[in-house]
């Protein structure tokens, strides 16, 4: 899957995590935008077009659950795949994310190969769903 055509939004309040993730994804050919909190993420989502969101849960201003809930409630944004990337490894948190509409859930630190395959799988599912419409 050619990644150059895809634009990803990385939402994480930790600068080191944002930088590491965005550099890794850019090396794979993705266009990457970073947001430092939930409110900024929603502002970007309402201004620009993204193919996938990598969303942390523990964010200032507006947490990842709130962002996910608003994103999935907005018909113009609800079809964007969301992969949760968080240090939280609780069954309740994972279940809540899936109930709110997350497409996948990765616990930090995660393997770069796993991340790459999960992103590809989400993008392929979205592409197939759009082709079927």
Task: Cite the ranges covered by each PLM segment.
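The feature encodes the CheY-like receiver
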Residues: 14, 18, 60, 69, ...
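C-terminal output helix
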Residues: 110-119
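Short hydrophobic/Thr-rich beta-strand motif most characteristic of the beta2 strand and flanking loop
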Residues: 29-36, 44
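Active-site beta3 strand of CheY-like receiver
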Residues: 48-54, 59
């Amino acid at each position: 899957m050619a990644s150059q055509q895809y634009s990803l939004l990385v939402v994480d309040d930790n600068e080191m995590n944002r930088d590491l993730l965005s550099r890794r994804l850019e090396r794979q050919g993705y266009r990457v935008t970073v947001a430092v909190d939930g409110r900024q993420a929603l502002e970007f989502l309402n201004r620009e077009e993204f193919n996938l969101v990598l969303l942390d849960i523990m964010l200032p201003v507006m947490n990842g659950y709130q962002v996910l809930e608003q994103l999935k409630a907005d018909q113009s944004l609800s079809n964007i795949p969301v992969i949760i990337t968080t240090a939280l490894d609780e069954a309740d948190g994972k279940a809540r994310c899936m109930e709110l509409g997350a497409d996948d859930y990765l616990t930090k630190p995660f393997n770069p190969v796993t991340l790459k395959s999960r992103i590809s799988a989400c993008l392929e599912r979205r592409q197939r769903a759009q082709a079927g419409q």
